Amino acid sequence: QVHTIVRMMRMITEIVCPGVLLLGEVVMEPEKVVPYFGTLEKPECHMLYNVTTMASTWHTIATADTRLLKHQMDIVTRLPKDYVFLNYLRCHDDIGWGLDYEWLKQFGIAEAPHKKYLNDYFRGYVEGSDARGELYNDDPVLQDARLCGTTASLCGLEAAGFEQNEEKTAQAIQRIEMLNAYLFIQSGIPVIYSGDEIGQVNDYSYKES
């Protein structure tokens, strides 16, 4: 039914307000995201947030393992050029770890403990990590949670500034530059916003209210 509704929305907007673009957000692995573009004959969304690549990129930072990201990019590059992704590193929203866990199983990676590792890494709870993120929608029963944080804070710039450590600051900046370079070579439209355009670190003022 979702696809029928989106298809109807696309048809209506093309008649009533043809200047409007439909931007969809689907937190799933690439194979399950693609159908929301529809087909060339029956199009649905004009663009989709590239949520999965965003999450897979941060997975790559935390694991220093590029296999998942390469696997996903191989899928994306084979898609029709009419399918446009909106690519970003971070945004106003959290990171939901909707990775391709079926594919990751072959490497002995299980979903629940891996999500915990990623959340621990990006909160600076893993040795060698200077990331500073915060949990969102933490469910201790399901052992599932989402993660919030700006690119600068997740890359270690916040911690380096707090410690006044010049070496860590330089490393964090290199990490940010690398991720943005990768963002700009992806197929689609790159977007830098929600504080990332000025290297903003996390704002904790919400805790004071």
Functional labels for PLM-detected ranges:
Residues 1-209:
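Active-site and adjacent substrate-binding regions of carbohydrate-active enzymes
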